[in-house]
Amino acid sequence: HSYGKSAVRELKDMVRACHSQGIEVVLEMPFVPGISANYVTECLRFYMLEYHVDGFVLNPYNVPWEQLIEDPFLKDIKLMQKDDGFQNVMRRFLKGDENMVNDVIWALKNRSSENGKCNYITTQTGFTLWDLVSYDCKHNEENGEKNLDGPDYNYSWNCGAEGPSRKRAVVNLRKNQVKNALELLLTAQGTPCLLAGDEFCNSQRGNNNAYCQDNETGWVNWT
């Protein structure tokens, strides 16, 4: 979302500012199944050449990996595949599902000798970390789709009360669960990815698909 008149200029300025501070910029590009390999390649080329981004996160479906790796314009940039495996294992472990210890150990230690690995427990497509420990079910009523949109299986646990709570025991348990999640994320082999706002327990009030909420629900309030 752009707050000015030129979204193109804003993004270019942001990438330039990040690079000046030694920060690489990696874009997530969620291509839908069935899209042509050439279209995917052209899109990535455009953002790399026009905006000078450093890499892309792609979904694992219908992505022409070999074509991208061999492309002369893209061969030296970072290409990452989105994988919810680590996320789901850690979420189930945190909520207390049985027989998860072996899966957690494997997920913490697993790392390819040939490729890098990025781990995440929350992303922009789903619950925030605070909502993950505050809601058992999604609450997307405000999206106008009769709460049918967004993931149904979140592997979340509300710690004893659905949504905001003033009970000290519930709030303290939620804070401990957030700390547990961050410890798992930061100690796992690979690069940790933290959703913006999770570091201060940002909430979307149970909305796990807030793409259409250009308001306090979807915003991250840094103040």
Task: Report each predicted region and the residues it spans.
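Conserved alpha/beta catalytic core and glycan-binding cleft of carbohydrate-active enzymes
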Residues: H52, Y61-A196, F200, N209-Q213
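Active-site-proximal loop/turn and secondary-structure-junction residues that shape catalytic pockets
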Residues: M29-P33, N62, F200-N202
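Substrate-binding cleft of carbohydrate-active enzyme catalytic domains
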Residues: H1-Y51, L58
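Residues that flank catalytic or metal-binding motifs in active/ligand-binding sites
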Residues: H1, G116, E216
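Short, function-defining helix-loop hinge/capping sites that tune catalysis or transport
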Residues: P30, S36, H139, G206-N207
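Extended hydrophobic/aromatic segments used for targeting, binding, or gating
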Residues: Q204-T223
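Repeat-unit-sized solenoid/scaffold elements
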Residues: E42-F46, Y51, K78, K82, ...
